From Swiss-Prot:
Species of origin: Pseudomonas syringae pv. tomato (strain ATCC BAA-871 / DC3000)
Listed PANTHER family: 39S RIBOSOMAL PROTEIN L18, MITOCHONDRIAL, LARGE RIBOSOMAL SUBUNIT PROTEIN UL18M
Protein name, per record: Large ribosomal subunit protein uL18
Functional description taken from the UniProt entry: This is one of the proteins that bind and probably mediate the attachment of the 5S RNA into the large ribosomal subunit, where it forms part of the central protuberance.
Encoding gene (name): rplR
Entry-linked CDD domains: Ribosomal_L18_L5e
Keyword rRNA-binding among UniProt keywords: yes
Family designation: Belongs to the universal ribosomal protein uL18 family.
GO BP annotation list: translation
Domain of life: Bacteria
HAMAP family (alphabetical): Ribosomal_uL18_B (MF_01337_B)
Lineage per the UniProt record: Bacteria, Pseudomonadati, Pseudomonadota, Gammaproteobacteria, Pseudomonadales
Length: 116
């Protein structure tokens, strides 16, 4: 692994430990060069309550690696989380910078009704 990835994973591990201690439901984000993924994970980390990604049938046809796609994923995961009965989450950015696609997803999830 590259040094950049190792430091990102270290940051993510520290943040997840704090969220686990608080026992809150978390919105976990992962991004690759082509896609973005979001999952709402239960407080104990054992169950995925809702998920959305650019690989979903509704989003697969358009562009998948840009800010517009991240916004659509954020709205979709917020809609699915509310359907599952989740309204408050902790935002787990998985060590990625809060910038660009990650920020767009978070803003869209907030607009969709999730409270961070």
């Amino acid at each position: 692994m590259t040094v950049k990835k190792v430091t990102r994973l270290r940051r993510a591990r520290k943040a997840r430990l704090k969220m686990h201690e608080l026992e809150v439901v978390r919105l976990c984000v992962h991004r690759s060069s082509q896609h973005i993924y979001a999952q709402v994970i239960s407080a104990d980390g054992s169950k995925v309550l809702a998920s959305a990604s650019t690989l979903d049938k509704e989003l697969r046809d358009g562009a998948t690696g840009n800010i517009d796609a991240a916004t659509k994923v954020g709205k979709l995961v917020a809609e699915r989380a509310k359907a599952a009965g989740v309204s408050q989450v902790a935002f787990d950015r998985s060590g990625f910078k809060y910038h660009g696609r990650v920020k767009a997803l978070a803003d869209a999830a907030r607009e969709g009704g999730l409270e961070f």
